[in-house]
Amino acid sequence: MKPPFDQFDHQIIQILHKDARTSASEIARLLNANERTIRKRIDRLVKLGAVRLTAIVDPEAFGYVTAVDIFLEVEPEHEDEVIQTFLTTPEVSYVALGQGNRDLSIECRFKTNDDMREFLRKKLPAISGGTVRGYSLVPRIIRNIDAWMPRDDDFRAETNNEEDI
């Protein structure tokens, strides 16, 4: 299946990736395009789920300097309730369901090592239906999800004219 995105979409995404506050008029100026076309393209990219225009919060700016990846095995009959618990747990910044003996992965953020220790020793064991299989202190994140971009060949669709947008 041919990707539904073309090189023009790629250029728009690259500009927004660099600075999501870039206005449609500025993108139009940079790409020598009509502002209306840019607005329609951005709306289409959002509607298709290709981009989300949101503020990304830096945990360290708020004092959350300790990150821990935690891997859990979850009893199938408790999967939904364990996931819901983590979705409402303020320390948890990421929840992913996987396959294998470590079928739930969470990332947690803490201001101090004492906060982390309290979570690992008291709060986490109190959650029924899951067993911690391992965890890893993350002293430095080299590349975060907000830095990821699709490959160039993901933008191979024919350039759409304005009526097709």
Model-identified regions with their sequence ranges:
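A compositional/biophysical signature of low hydrophobicity enriched in polar/charged and small residues
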Residues: M1-I165
